[in-house]
C-alpha cells in the first residue's frame, strides 16, 4: 500500500488520467535521473489501480512528453509530444493501440504553424470530442507569437478524424505569464466547464478557470488553485461518477539552486525538482461552481486502526486524560510531546479553543527541545493557517511554505486530519494529507 506512489529508483512526473474496464489506468512520465538498474526505462508508463493505494506498473515504450489518451470504438489513441534542440522545436505525435500495451506510432506529425503559435512552445496535447461542434478538439500548451515573453496560452486545433488538424485562434490567452499554460485539461461538471493548467512562472502550481461555455469568458475564481504550491501538472479523470485530480509533489534532491543557510540539515530552501510522488484528490463542486479537493475515499479510509497516545508535558500548563489534553499558556509558549508516530499513519483529532486565542496547532519532527520541527499554526486573529519550520525560532530546519488565509467560526470545533507517510521521499508539505519523516507531534 502506498499513499503517494513513486516508482523505485525513479520519480513520477506528469500524469495522464485514464479509466477503462472498471480500473483506473493512469499513464505517467517516468524519469530515472540516471539510474541504470533493471527498471530504468524512461518515458510513458501505465499504472493500474482500483483504489489509488495498490498499483501495478507497465511500460508503454513511448518516449515523449505529456499528452492524453482516449478510446474510440475498440481503438485507443495516445497523443503526446516530442522535442528538438538547435533550433528548439516541439511537435505533437499520435500512437494507437488495441490493448494499451503495444503502441504503433502514426506517421503524421503536428508542428506549430509559426503564424499564430510559437514552434518552441507546442506540447501537452489534450484531445476531446466537442459534441456541439461535432469535431475533435485539441488543447495545446503553447505561446502565441508576440513582442513580449508574456505569451503563454492554451492553443486550439480541430479535426474530423484525429489525423488531420486545422489551426484555430487560442482557446484561452490571458497573456499574463511566460512559458506556457502546461498540461491543459478540460471537463464539465453540472453547468460549468473547467479549464485546468499549470504554470511554473506563476506560483509553480495547478490553476483552474471556469466558464458556462466553451467559448468563454473564462473566469478566475478568488481562490483559483487546486491544492497548494508545487502540486504540479495536475490533470483530472473520472470513473463515471466521481472526478479525481492527479498531480505530482516534487522532490528537492538534485544539486541545483539552493538557498539553505550553511550547516542546515534540511533541504527546505532547495529548488523544486521536476517529478516526485503521485498525489490523488477527489474534486468536488461548491454551490457557487468553484472547486475544492478532498481526500480520495479509499486513501482516507486506509488507516483505521486506533492506538493510544502517551502525553509528555514540556512547557505550559497541561491536564491529560485518556482521550483529551488541555493545554494552557497564558503569556507564552506551551506544548506537549506525543508518541513517536509510525512510518505510515493518519493523525486525527479535534481542537477546541476560546475567543482571544492567538495561535495553536501541531508540530512534526520536533525533538524534546523543540529545536527542530515543522509547525502547522492556526491563527484565528489573522484568519490564517501557516506552515513554518523551526528556523524562525532559532532551530535547525529551514522555513517551509505558507498556506492561504482561511475563514473562521469561533463557535465551531476545528477538526484536523493530516496523513503522515515516511515511505514517501518527497518534500514535507501540508494539504489534506502530507508526507514527512517519522516524528514526534505536538
Predicted regions span which residues?
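Beta-strand-rich interaction surfaces with strong enrichment in secreted/lumenal proteins
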Residues: 222-223, 333-340, 410-416
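Short tryptophan-centered beta-strand motifs in secreted/extracellular beta-sheet-rich domains
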Residues: 186, 347-351, 412-437
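Intrinsic-disorder/low-complexity, polar/charged segments enriched in Ser/Thr/Lys/Arg/Asp/Glu/Gln
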Residues: 23, 322-324, 344-348, 421-423
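Short, aromatic/His-centered strand-loop micro-motif at the edge of beta-sheets
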Residues: 395-423
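Secretory/extracellular carbohydrate-interaction modules
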Residues: 325-396
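Beta-rich carbohydrate-recognition and catalytic domains
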Residues: 1-124, 128-179, 188-228, 241-242, ...
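Solvent-exposed loop and beta-edge segments used for protein-protein assembly and interaction
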Residues: 132, 321, 341-345, 354-356, ...
